[in-house]
Design a protein with these regions (language model features):
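Extended glycan-interaction surfaces of carbohydrate-active proteins
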Residues: 1-29, 66-151, 177
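Extended amphipathic secondary-structure runs
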Residues: 10-56
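Well-ordered alpha-helical segments within folded domains of soluble proteins
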Residues: 30-45, 95-107, 149-165
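Generic structural signal for well-ordered, non-transmembrane alpha-helical segments
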Residues: 38, 62-65, 69
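Structural helix-adjacent loops and short alpha-helical linkers that scaffold large soluble proteins
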Residues: 45-65, 107-121, 163-176
Length: 177
């Protein structure tokens, strides 16, 4: 229902990104999406280096560095992971979603990787498969929906890649098994 309403609202705005950003009641900064963007920017920088495009490489790295710094404002010490930020309510969304764990897909600080790894290990005590989109004990958990349910294959893959890159190989094995 909400998705249909949003789609109709965005269509009424002519799919204009600026209007959508101003008028949408759904303005969430998601650490998972940002991790994907950061990693993509760093990959673009590597590609630009290989093509002798120093300016593109520099801009891409600068963007990634700035975004990584901004990610820290999304960290929740209490939950041991990053949280989404609601730009309308101007507050962190106190929901331990998989997006906050997906942040390890970007080169976040090693301390954060270790804390996220510990959070995932705690999740492993509640379920047979990692990584659940929400902890099975959380009220948001819905076993029939991948966004709030037991597993989400591509997101789990990206979490495993990020953990592997950060040296958390034992946990990677637990996720892929």
């Amino acid at each position: 229902k909400r998705y249909i309403w949003l789609a109709q609202k965005f269509r009424s705005l002519g799919w204009d990104n600026a209007d959508i950003a101003r008028q949408s009641p759904f303005q969430i900064v998601d650490p998972g999406f940002n991790a994907i963007l950061i990693r993509s920017s760093l990959a673009l920088a590597e590609l630009a280096d290989a093509l002798d495009e120093a300016e593109v490489a520099s801009q891409s790295r600068a963007f990634a560095d700035k975004a990584l710094g901004s990610m820290e404002s999304l960290w929740s010490e209490a939950l041991g992971q990053y949280l989404c930020y609601d730009r309308v309510a101007k507050t962190l969304v106190q929901s331990p979603s998989i997006g906050g764990l997906l942040a390890v897909f970007a080169p976040v600080p090693q301390q954060r990787v270790e804390e996220i790894a510990q959070t995932i290990r705690k999740l492993a005590e509640q379920t047979n498969y990692l990584v659940a989109s929400h902890p099975p004990s959380a009220p948001e958990f819905d076993e029939l929906r991948y966004w709030r349910g037991p597993v989400w294959l591509i997101v789990n893959y990206m979490i495993a890649v990020g953990l592997r890159d950060a040296g958390q190989t034992d946990l990677v094995q637990r996720i892929v098994d």
